[in-house]
Swiss-Prot record:
Reported function: Modulates RecA activity.
Keyword ATP-binding: no
GO cellular component, one term: cytoplasm
Compositionally biased tracts (Basic and acidic residues): 15-27
Name of the protein: Regulatory protein RecX
Annotated region described as Disordered, given as residue ranges: 1-28
GO biological process per UniProt: regulation of DNA repair
Keywords, comma-separated and alphabetical: Cytoplasm
Native source organism of the sequence: Streptomyces coelicolor (strain ATCC BAA-471 / A3(2) / M145)
Family: Belongs to the RecX family.
Coiled coil: none
Location(s), subcellular: Cytoplasm
Gene behind the chain: recX
Amino acid sequence: MEPSAEDGGATSSSRAEKGEPPRDPVEQARAICLRLLTGTPRTRRQLAEALRKREIPEEAAEEVLSRFEEVGLINDGAFAQAWVESRHHGRGLARRALARELRTKGVEAALIDVAVSQLDTEQEEETARDLVARKLRATRGLDRDKRLRRLAGMLARKGYSEGMALRVVRQALEEEGEDTEHLGDEGF
């Protein structure tokens, strides 16, 4: 393309190449969504909020979001399943914590239930044991009750139930030779 007086002598007249935002609200919404989806998957609600913050008209936002869902660029179910897989294996989060995170991201309850059902109680307990085993050494030298509170508290913050947390921590302490017979069930 030849430079012209209209485009200031630039060799390109594409707004995208000049870094200018498109003027049409639908094009603006499409560009914003594509840019956000490039870095990481996002939920429909996250994208809708981003468009709302950028003052994209609701009709244009809805049109783009619906089209992106049709072609599979937005898929809250797949997002939820990938999130559960990643956060459980990467951070050791339990079903309860994962469900809470997905709710804050705007995933529907039915999709959350399907995603967290990937994890069964045995997997959760095995992950809890691994987490406790990694932290156990750092608590050596502390009294038994303090160790129990710290380790069970760590599991609770990751979404594990009180019962499972106490059971897993007791087992780990027993395997280490701690006397856990008189540890109360009053919580941590």
